[in-house]
Amino acid sequence: KKITMGQAVQKLQNYCLDKGQQEGMRYAETVLQKYPNCFEVVYHSAHIYALSMDAKCMPRAVELYERALELIDQNEEDQINASTIQNGIAQCYCCMNRTDDAIEILKKNNFEGKNNYRIGLLLSRDKKKTKEALQYLSDALCRSYGELYNICIGYANAYGHMKDVNRVRDIVLWLQKTGSELRKPDVVNWMDRGDVGLFTILAETDISQRNEQGAYQWLLRAKESAEKFDAAPCYRLDAGMKFYHNDDKATSYDDMGETAKEIIEKIMKDSSEEKALRRIWKKVCEETGGKEKV
């Protein structure tokens, strides 16, 4: 039966999803004979071989991935690029117990530190490379938390648009608890600045449900965290982190304002509950001291 290129690609993708590797590999070899210069056919065929996790199949996977790199200009899928293909080759090398080769590829292909967790994991398997592993893992942990923070804020924004206040509260509370487990107690650091935003969002959720006492307590915590951070600003990633082992002096940053207290102002200004939040914020400032306006 004649099969089009599009049908062949779809069937290869289905084999990847269904994990039908043996049948998938046989099918891949058939369509590769017909479409040897089609990027999608070559790439998804390589992926089928790689998914087998069988060391004997990895050389063929690598061969096909390398061929896919030669055809990369045909690629139209946003989630696939030269970096993802190189990572695929590295994974194949891991299955072949060629760990050093895998690490070398991952290091060369480590744009914005995206492979730090992969490199750290592989290095951690060798006792002699523990120090280097911890350096990569430390950087990966900080990057992952930063990404997680922004992901959760994105969720909170989306749930806010949906008027799903309970989910906003749940995900922000979970994020704040997760962050608190990663830091040393009583050490002021960049996570205090992050908490200012989280506490202010939680105040917003309470005020939207007419829980003014709850909103007061969250704004009080936001104020305390902001004043603590602004008194001794520290953006260094290594400050106060439980599991940080890197020697560099990397720093965190955001676009929420010059001071932590400005974060409270920015969130209130953008809130649909601005009037009520400002009334309670004024009360917090009057009762605890400090300026209402930033």
What are the roles of these predicted feature ranges?
Residues 46, 50-55, 76, 124-128, ...:
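Short coil/turn linking the two alpha-helices of tandem helical-hairpin repeats
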Residues 14-26, 53-67, 90-100, 123-135, ...:
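Helix-turn-helix repeat elements of alpha-solenoid scaffolds
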Residues 3-9, 37-42, 77-86, 109-118, ...:
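Generic helix N-cap/helix-start motif at coil->alpha-helix transitions
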Residues 28-39, 67-82, 104-107, 139-149, ...:
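Flexible helix-coil transition and linker loops at the boundaries of alpha-helical arrays
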Residues 64-70, 110-112, 142, 169-180, ...:
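TPR/TPR-like (Sel1-like) alpha-helical repeat modules
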Residues 6-40, 44-56, 88:
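Alpha-helical segment of the N-proximal tetratricopeptide repeat
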Residues 15, 49-52, 93, 123, ...:
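Residue at a conserved register position within TPR or TPR-like alpha-solenoid repeats
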Residues 10, 44-48, 88, 118, ...:
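"A position-specific structural signal for the A-helix of alpha-solenoid helical repeats
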